[in-house]
């Protein structure tokens, strides 16, 4: 009989092992067996919890996305009610420590690539994209006309993704301060235009 609570402990252990395996071997080198070996358990247990490699990647991405959404919620709550502060909070959440470690960044890159081919991953990517756009648009709409708010949200979302992607591909540790500075300058520029 399994121990109570062991399912979540084991799933977390396997997700951590997946992140580390993708970091070391890439997605193509990540197998149920390599994840099981890293977690020091049998391949059958990995199959039991996730079914196959696609199920394991989906669960890993859901974990990363939950961390992102939690960081976004936490930072938005801590921000002042002003749209500028809330926009900056959304940006900061996307560059949160939970999103910019080497293993997480490499897993994001693998996820983006696979989401073009796997419907379940495509749905996750779509939800994430829509959530970011919706959050940004809601804040910009408090300061800008609706059409301008939509353009601003699209532009800032593209900037966040671009800064993140350049950082991920650089091979160096992610420069969170530089990314925040650029994105926050862009927010200031957009909001200054509305005040003019």
UniProtKB/Swiss-Prot annotation:
Pathway named in the protein's UniProt entry: Amine and polyamine biosynthesis; betaine biosynthesis via choline pathway [regulation]
Keywords: DNA-binding, Repressor, Transcription, Transcription regulation
GO terms of molecular function: DNA-binding transcription factor activity; transcription cis-regulatory region binding
GO BP, sorted A to Z: glycine betaine biosynthetic process from choline; negative regulation of DNA-templated transcription
SUPFAM superfamilies, per the entry: Homeodomain-like, Tetracyclin repressor-like, C-terminal domain
Record has Repressor as a keyword: yes
Residue span(s) of domain HTH tetR-type: 8-68
DNA-binding residues (ranges): 31-50
Family annotation (InterPro entries): BetI_C, DNA-bd_HTH_TetR-type_CS, Homeodomain-like_sf, HTH-type_TetR-like_transc_reg, HTH_TetR, Tet_transcr_reg_TetR-rel_C_sf, Tscrpt_rep_BetI
Protein role: Repressor involved in the biosynthesis of the osmoprotectant glycine betaine. It represses transcription of the choline transporter BetT and the genes of BetAB involved in the synthesis of glycine betaine.
Name of the protein described by the UniProt record: HTH-type transcriptional regulator BetI
